[in-house]
């Protein structure tokens, strides 16, 4: 059962002005050497009616003074047990640690709240861990004095490297600098890896400070070729990440913003870097053309393409073939759209290329839709290249029902009649004959198709169809008519085959 004093202490948020020191002491609301103590918020106390501090800070101070009564009061006000341990360690009051230590699951959890190196180390001792654990936690919570105190045990390069990497990853700059300047390391250049990975400018500048103070034994700063190679590699990484200020910092020490570096800026659409260095280096037209081709190959953004085209005054006549090849290679035709707006039309060569590379119908549909290309044109191009499967795929998408075969049949015959390209005609006629074999034609329509084959010198299809028609009424006179057409067109093979058929009649 709670006493009246306990209830008052826990829930009385505002003390009456009439309470004197004796009354406060009786209520347990008097803190020796400090004065009256009252709770004013869930997480704060009012000391001597003129000082507001957090409950946990008050708890730390009370524990450091060994004031168990005030500690108990503050804990009832929802204070954190961690601050009892911290304060007790500061004042060496191990009786409080013994009393409240059972409330602590893991003393490592307290370390983040400690700001004094001596207290930090004493708290870590309570966890009964080894020295390596202490050093790692000292890095984690930025306790450089602990590393300095135990400098004599940090002699193993491999372990020091592990600590250095941890400090870099945790971004504990004072510790990074101290380890880099003081301890022997296997790979001090690791600092640069983290600097670029985290885009951490402070680590980059520290890295260069260590490098040029001869703290990186693996890199000879007096070997100009090696140094330029390292710095240029850094410039390439910075361009990849879009870290413009990293590049400026690196250039203070050397390096070369070459085409490989600028190509990374293009690939990742870092226009600020591109714009700055194209102007600064006064790049030749040839180099800018190369960058444009890199942009096309990597599907760069419209803004990146536009920037590079603007430096070329949208004139690309020297690299038209290469542009088309780059577009065909990666399938991104954004540049074709841009150039068309500038009256540079690469639509047809690109379409021919896409057909040659046998891009999917879905892709080609996007392309012909974007540039408002008639399907007939695409089919004729595919026919010229002998891409029969592509034409079939296209027609299957356009005419989805089996009933549409008749429409396809007429459509293809009309295309053949408007084509001059011999191979293209042959490709379409092969498809027409395939369709003929699965549809039913009236006698009149069969004769029309035979005449069509003769008109276009489709000897193989004519002979194949002859077998289906030789018993039809009026076929022999029709053959004579076909012979006249073949003679007028001067188709020797067709003439010879028709004459042979007439002899057999």
Curated annotation (Swiss-Prot):
Pfam family, one: DUF249
Keyword Ribosomal protein found: no
InterPro entries: MGF_505
Record's keyword terms, sorted: Early protein
Inducing or repressing factors: Expressed in the early phase of the viral replicative cycle.
Role, per record: Plays a role in virus cell tropism, and may be required for efficient virus replication in macrophages.
Family: Belongs to the asfivirus MGF 505 family.
Protein name in UniProt: Protein MGF 505-4R
Organism listed in the record: African swine fever virus (strain Badajoz 1971 Vero-adapted)
